[in-house]
Amino acid sequence: VKALLGCGSLDENTYIITDEASGVSAVIDPNFEFIKAEDAVKGLNVKYILLTHGHFDHVFGADFVHTTYGLLPRLSADEQATYAAAAEQMRMFLHRDFPLLLPTPGAPFAEGDVIAVGTLRLRVIATPGHTPGGVCFYEESEGVLLSGDSLFDGEIGRCDLPGGDEDTLVSVLQRKVLTLPEDVTVLP
């Protein structure tokens, strides 16, 4: 797992998951910095753009990956409206207009789906609450959970944005994330 850490005050992380055996990779939550990080994907066999949710800071670099690799970003069906509103979110947070090109999403995934990245298996865990259709990706054999904004470093994700619901997020995390093995590494 290669991390491209957060950008400025938004502090969003992008991850590149690569299966060592096959060289197949997935880009998860391509952020603002990602479009300046061409070297991070140079020579990789990128097969997926995976989004934990549709907030603008997690999708800003999706068009770069789409243009470079001809891939469509994938997110949950319940997250399509959040993704479609990314430019509006950016205006709300940054108080200015930026060009935000969003490729049409590819096939949505759902709770329990398994995405094969070479020999790695990312299981989709639906974790609504930060957004209506947010997810985490769990790779059991490596003991890694990619949490998006469902979990921050040391705390739960914020729930005060449109579509957020703290009770839902807490309940989901208790039922689905806290039941994972204790030695799981969480990558927010």
Protein language model regions, located:
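Divalent metal-coordination and catalytic microenvironments
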Residues: 17, 29, 53, 65, ...
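Metallo-beta-lactamase
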Residues: 89-92, 121-188
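Conserved beta-strand hairpin/beta-sheet module of binuclear metal-dependent hydrolase folds
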Residues: 1-44, 136-148
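Active-site HxH/HxHxD metal-binding segment of metal-dependent hydrolases
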Residues: 32-116, 120
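Residue-level marker for the onset of beta-strands and adjacent loop->beta junctions
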Residues: 13, 24, 105, 111-113, ...
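Short Gly/Pro-enriched turn/cap motifs at secondary-structure boundaries
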Residues: 5-7, 104-106, 126-128
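Short, glycine/acidic-enriched loop or turn micro-motifs at the edges of active sites
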Residues: 22, 32, 56, 129, ...
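Residue-level marker for buried hydrophobic side chains located in beta-strands
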Residues: 26-28, 50, 73, 146, ...
